[in-house]
């Protein structure tokens, strides 16, 4: 029987199974093309994930066969109970991996071969799983967890393939004409007894190895100030049908609404293009005859203070047109490949293009950029030379230039390895497929994907849960609460005349500042390895809020009428989940108070679970607040994230001093000499308050 060995410890030999490099390159990308079972040089040795050495979590190939652009390895997996495969969905005739767009989806399985079945019960608003993916989470038979992720080298990219028989293959390739060389990174994997630490440990290792990433932890990044405030985006209201007059009229309507929207994000529809290729950085002259000047004049410090603009990383959806108006020195840093102009081929030329690109937007007066279509930049280069290096340089140049010019950056359609692993400065990335008004199944899928993907993305960025409609009669208020607990940007896309203030004001203070959690919401342990659209069970997420609270939302995301009503719960032990986010969960509390936000009621949790009935597509928000020295601080009851509305300055057995961040009704729980009381204190002005028992 073939011996299974650790990949880094042995000389590697292989079986030739690839057409020569001089033949037509198999990686030239086009819509509908898949890379399943792509021709590769098959390595004899097996990557054995049973052998875990914490000190060497990144596996490297030390002996790369000559003249090979693509290698493949069999992957030996430990005994497992169930898992998640992270890949996009696969639609015949549609774009495929590595163009993951916003479609890195969590596919649940008991056995890997489940994912290959035509009757796989997946996500109703999406197609079947792609066999090609970027990450894998396993719950092991011994109770531990294993997380494995594909990685990029200087000019290589790895990916996983789930095979029909349930086996797993790892590929690594240049995705082009050149051969693999040097010390070749293959994958990263970590094991842990904690389902949360297995992700954070893997990212600690990834960040530490500068050969395979350009990353910092989310907590170490600066969060762009505009994203602390409520915004509005044109996309879901208009899609491509925007122009200067409409935007100016909407700014008038926003200001008249009384809702303190502080930034406007102008989405797609303004770009000068030919056949979906960029022709100019000047906006479409028919739609914007005055350029951006009239719109920029509407910025005011106490109203709409910031303006953001949508663009594509590659120019426009299909790259850059040869028929462009760029200065000669900029044209010289572009090269023609496969029907498009692209930045390159050198790192210096790519930096020059993005310096021009970002500087132009800065000079127009924009404060931040939403850069979309990022995962399609790699396919535009595929089949050529230095594919990975050039595509990666595009992401890095964007990071360098927006940081240097102090421009905010929202990353969108940025869910392949090159995008995810090179957010050096930017702190926001879209976590899911678009939200659509009135589409219940899509909303459920959106929530499931957003929260689960945050286990990965949330290590290095805040998750952008996409814009939403406050007027959505299916889930407007539910979506507002999910945006609040996400911690990411919150931006509306209603027609301003349709704003529903009751769904918006609980998100913000009087200036439009969002009450945010201390870390982004992720699923509770029992919810991570289940598909809540099919499970017949409730789905729960949590985030640390304020100085010491934990907020929990319980959902019914089931799509089957058989599970229209499900039961959920909160319990004392949930509070300890704060520790998994890197925040303190001091066990010195006397007890845990559960505040039901919808019912505005509170109860002390005992040893048993507090049961909750969820009927239909609904949610239930709780704040778990520790009782210390006879006090539990809930916060302003009118705001979704009540604990985030106050800062605890001092607490004794007789006195509590708080800094309250907004007006409203302050809820405080007290226990004095056996008398328990849930107090309501009107706050007419934000600031310091002293409360005595």
Name each model-derived stretch.
Residues 1-25:
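Bacterial Sec-dependent N-terminal signal peptides
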Residues 483-486, 491, 530-590, 621-629, ...:
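Carbohydrate-binding surface patches
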Residues 317-362, 396-503, 522-530:
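Glycan-recognition surfaces
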Residues 292-299, 389-409:
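Alpha-helix-loop-beta-strand connector modules within alpha/beta enzyme cores
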Residues 605-646, 666-667, 675-693:
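C-terminal beta-strand-rich structural cap/linker in extracellular carbohydrate-active enzymes
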Residues 79-92, 574-599, 669-681:
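Solvent-exposed beta-hairpin/edge-strand motifs
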Residues 225-388:
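Aromatic-lined carbohydrate-binding/catalytic grooves of carbohydrate-active enzymes
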Residues 25-263, 285-288, 306:
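Carbohydrate-recognition beta-sandwich/jelly-roll modules
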